[in-house]
């Protein structure tokens, strides 16, 4: 996978995606999430790949093991670069996801969501009834993902250093919640700058609104890219 900031294509239509991608004359690493995939379907993935871009298909699969395994068989045929599941689905579900993916595809990386970057300590305790710190909850899910054979996790950059120490540098830490200095944090809570994420051990960062909603998306992307790759 490219060592580039992953741009979250948080658009509701193919037309808006194409207008955005037309601004760039280089190969990108982009994320397609639920909103866009459910609106436009697999054909959009094929079109983005044909443009030469890497794709992270961010659907966060979470269901019974058999359903997730069968769903992953279908997604494997899209030949994206990165897919994910929810670690909360458990070891059996994650194992079936790997089996489904590998029936048709050997190169796509698969990672697990631990805790969303919008989650706070209060939400963890009072809504999820998990009576540990966010760091401990993330580490527990990351250990399960690692033991199951997944390539890494989605986590906050604030947990990246801990996960590198516990699970090694090669274990992927894909981190949303990235904001340039001075940018609005929107609905994210556990956030850092691109430079801080690199220093903390994140292997990939995901950036959406600071690029896609910028007055000059190309300039904003290059500034974030430069700060990430230093």
From Swiss-Prot:
Binding locations of substrate: 10, 31, 58-67, 117, 179, 188, 208-209
Pathway assignment: Pyrimidine metabolism; UMP biosynthesis via de novo pathway; UMP from orotate: step 2/2
Gene3D superfamilies the UniProt entry points to: Aldolase class I (3.20.20.70)
Catalytic site positions: 60 (proton donor)
Pfam families with a match to the protein in the record: OMPdecase
Molecular-function annotations in GO: orotidine-5'-phosphate decarboxylase activity
GO CC terms, sorted: cytosol
Keyword vocabulary terms for this entry: Decarboxylase, Lyase, Pyrimidine biosynthesis
Broad EC category: lyase
Coiled-coil segments: none
GO BP: 'de novo' pyrimidine nucleobase biosynthetic process; 'de novo' UMP biosynthetic process
The organism's place on the tree of life at top rank: Bacteria
Reaction(s) catalysed by this chain's protein: orotidine 5'-phosphate + H(+) = UMP + CO2
InterPro entries noted in UniProt: Aldolase_TIM, OMPdecase, OMPdecase_AS, OMPdecase_bac, OMPdeCOase_dom, RibuloseP-bd_barrel
Subunit record text: Homodimer.
Known function: Catalyzes the decarboxylation of orotidine 5'-monophosphate (OMP) to uridine 5'-monophosphate (UMP).
Family: Belongs to the OMP decarboxylase family. Type 1 subfamily.
Protein name: Orotidine 5'-phosphate decarboxylase
